[in-house]
Amino acid sequence: MNYPRSKKYCTPALLQKIMGPNPVKLEEELLLHHRIPQNAVVCDLGSGQGLTSVFLAKEYGFTVYAADLWSDPEENRAFFRAQGLTDAEIIPVKADATALPFEREFFDGVVSTDSYNYFGRDPAYLDEKLLPFVKKGGYIY
C-alpha cells in the first residue's frame, strides 16, 4: 500500500515519538475508507506523545482530543503548537480510557491506533465505557 499522507511524517524528529510500529501508517490504513466528516470532534484514544493526533488534525481536518493516561498534556501541547496547530484544533487530555472525563455523546468519532488492546480487553468496555461518549451515528476506528 502507498501511504501518501503518512510519508510527510517520516522525519527523524517525528519518528522519535514512535514507540512501536509506525502508528501514522497504521492510522492512514485504518482510515482509508472512513466516514467521519471533516470538522468532526474526534477522540484520539491512547494518543501517546501525540503524533497520531497531529495526523488526525492536519490530514483529516478533525478537532482532536488527544487522550492518554501516560503522556504529559503540557509536553503534548508544546509539540502540537510546534507542529502549527492551535489549542482549538487539538486538545491534550490526561485521561484513563476506563473513566473518560467527557460529556455523554461528545464525540463524532473515536480513533484508537495501536492502543485499544490495553484497555478494551474487558468484554463490557465498549458498551459501558466508550460508546456512551460517541454521538448516535458516530464512528469508532
Each predicted region: which residue ranges?
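Conserved alpha-helix/loop element of class I SAM-dependent methyltransferases that forms part
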Residues: G20-Q38
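Structural signature of beta-strand start/N-cap positions in the alpha/beta core
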Residues: V41, T63, F106-D108
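Class I SAM-dependent methyltransferase SAM/SAH-binding core
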Residues: C43, Q49-A99
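A short acidic, Gly/Pro-enriched loop at the edge of an enzyme's catalytic core
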Residues: T98-V110
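A short SAM/SAH-binding and catalytic strip from SAM-dependent methyltransferases
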Residues: G109-D122
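A short glycine-rich, Lys/Arg-flanked "PGG" loop and its adjoining helix->strand segment in the class I
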Residues: A124-Y139
